[in-house]
Amino acid sequence: MAKHVAVLMGGWSPEREVSLRSGAGCAKALEEVGYRVTRVDVDRDVAEVLARLKPDVALNLLHGCPGEDGTIQGILEILRIPYSHSGVLASALAMDKARAKVVMAAAGIPVPGGHLVTRAEAAKGHVLPPPYVLKPNTGGSSVGVFIVKEDQPHPPQELFRADWTFGESLMAEPFIKGLELTCGVMGDRALDVIEVEAVHGFYDYESKYAAGGSRHILPARVLPQIYQQVRMLALEAHRALGCRGISRADFRYDDTLPDGKGLVCLEVNTQPGMTETSLVPDMAAHAGISFGELVTWMVEDATLDR
């Protein structure tokens, strides 16, 4: 009998639409290779829905809360449904940028400087010398991320709108010039390194998910030793945070500094996108792994107690 896979997608975070796209593509790929698939658009009754479905495996394709912060992982552990990607602790830790940076720095992984500020503090004036980056301490897909430039008298007013939904805690980091590099990890294997070039300057939400919004340059145009250093650090970050299954580490690289000193790890994404424009499927394809094989691997890798 074909394995029954519940594909978890949607949810209520600002990344809902990306999750629905990831889920739809993966569900289709699983059906094509013979799995029995139920698409679950996650709402607050998800525990009841999953208890009724009793799937063999849950493929977690949620982004943001509740799928990326340990919440859905805890529900699946209670229901004893094997699931993909990282477990409760690693998910919660990686979702909190400040705490994840502490862990990675302790493991010897270079991370950017900076500190946490509240929205109220940011509203009063510059919290770092410009240029610097302000982003929600929890969240992904570059949603709510702003670069504050030298010619701006104050941070972007979008941060202080009444309909802001990304929390009161912001991470302020110095802006690091240079290349945007990213590397996926698949189990204990680092995939290849992509250089991301945004068409309109900043690799924001629109650049990530709009057709033609960015270029994925694979392999990245860096020296071989930097390329291998990125792969090594991505795997080390995956392990330091306790990640499982698929993750993706994002880096900035200032090639004007000597001996690779310009390379820093910005963050680790435990639920990287799986849409038609996403990075991990591109990396896998470059390694000879088809999209169907990648999704099948995630299902077969699923366990409890992750």
Swiss-Prot record:
Indicate the family of this protein: Belongs to the D-alanine--D-alanine ligase family.
Q: Report the cofactor remark.
A: Binds 2 magnesium or manganese ions per subunit.
The UniProt entry, under Gene3D superfamilies, shows: 3.40.50.20, ATP-grasp fold, A domain (3.30.1490.20), ATP-grasp fold, B domain (3.30.470.20)
Keywords noted in UniProt: ATP-binding, Cell shape, Cell wall biogenesis/degradation, Cytoplasm, Ligase, Magnesium, Manganese, Metal-binding, Nucleotide-binding, Peptidoglycan synthesis
| Position of the signal peptide | none
Q: Name one Pfam family in it.
A: Dala_Dala_lig_C
Compartments, as annotated in UniProt: Cytoplasm
Q: For binding ATP, which residues are annotated in this chain's numbering?
A: 128-182
Main subcellular localisation: cytoplasm
Gene Ontology cellular component terms for the protein in this record: cytoplasm
Q: Name one GO molecular function term.
A: metal ion binding
Name of protein: D-alanine--D-alanine ligase
Q: Which organism is it from?
A: Azorhizobium caulinodans (strain ATCC 43989 / DSM 5975 / JCM 20966 / LMG 6465 / NBRC 14845 / NCIMB 13405 / ORS 571)
> EC number(s)?
6.3.2.4
Cite the ATP-grasp domain residue spans from the record. Answer: 101-300
